[in-house]
Amino acid sequence: MVKVNLGGCSSFVNDADYKAYVEKALAALDVLETETGAGNDFLGWKHLPSQTPDCLISECEQVRDSWKAKGVDLVVVIGIGGSYLGAKCALEALSHTFANSLKGERSVPQIVFAGHNLSEEYISELMDLMKERNCAAVVISKSGTTTEPAVAFRLIKQYIEQTYGVKEASERIVAVTDAHRGALKSLSTQEGYKTFVIEDNVGGRFSVLTPVGILPIVLGGFDVRAMLKGAAEMEEACARNCECNPAVQYAAMRNLLYDNGKKVEILVSYNPKLQYLGEWWKQLYGESEGKDGKGIFPASVSFTTDLHSMGQYIQDGMRMLMETVITVENSNRSMTIANDPQNLDGLNFLTGKHVEECNAMAELGTKLAHIDGGVPQLSISVERINEYNLGALFYFFEKACGISGYMLGVNPFDQPGVEAYKKNMFALLGKPGYEEQAKALKERL
């Protein structure tokens, strides 16, 4: 279960203002629950935890078992934005940090990602890896025409067909796409690919608990049922029309701080396994709130590492910051610090302490220092990193994002600004139909 602690904000806001913002958050929650707000045709994510059928997970497990029987030891997941960040976040959080370097036979394939950039070096080096491995691919796109994943898929599809033959390739490629339309759906039907559906009413950044995230997480060997259970408990908790609703608490405080001049929110973690939670969170809030000249700018850091780079700015820089700290109460591993008779490093006072105890005290000390430096602290805690708690975090942040966007007065479920770079890129690449725009752009260069 996710717990919210706003004590680190008490010296920056007063109770009356907070209560007023709670009322605003509850009003926004009502709009979300009654589906009467902007973007209400993209609310299919709200009940995914409680309504996802077990047969969907079983289908994903069948893909896993089929590929295991073929000896597949490398799966390339192709997608961008919400089509890869949720799965990447889950796999990074749940996997052994050095799983790909440990000796011994792996029980699950290595999962790598493509289609989230246009780097020629990246895709070429990925191909180098594929040539040494037994490969399969998951391509994720509603349309099949998004440039980055479409380019990567064209190259990877050609490689798999050339290596294994067209018929076998059709059993090594799975598509997650629209149910009825789009280039990828048409190609999948033509080639005979197994497909999973992205529903029309779920946007990419809210799709981690659909086949977009579920399939790669199952392929990675993790317990999606536990993840959905954690998310389902948060679905219930975050629907409550009361101040005890954790999503309401978080949305209310971050909007109050925003209106008080804190325009940048930094998501802080103290475990490198959660680095990609920050990347997923940045897309979720950046695309949902950054529009109409409004929005909190989302950033992320990994402490204690980034205390030795960004720590100086956070402590002493411009006072436009707030921090949301992800606290993990218990470690999944245990290691104590040994005594050293020479004590040249002066650390014998730590003898017998767990490394995680040092991490916890670094977290507490940093919170207090940053409060003293004028940076409010919102704390989000979970008991440990596992599937259940990760599912709870996913749903908590999604629900709070919808509430927060409505409080801000924007549509949290569209992303019109994303099209601007695409139009320029298409024009500069010579896509038919963009000739006039290309001419205008080239005059500026």
Give names to the regions the model predicted:
Residues 92-95, 127-130, 154-156, 189-191, ...:
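Short, solvent-exposed amphipathic alpha-helical segments in soluble enzyme
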Residues 299-385:
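Helicase-primase coupling helices
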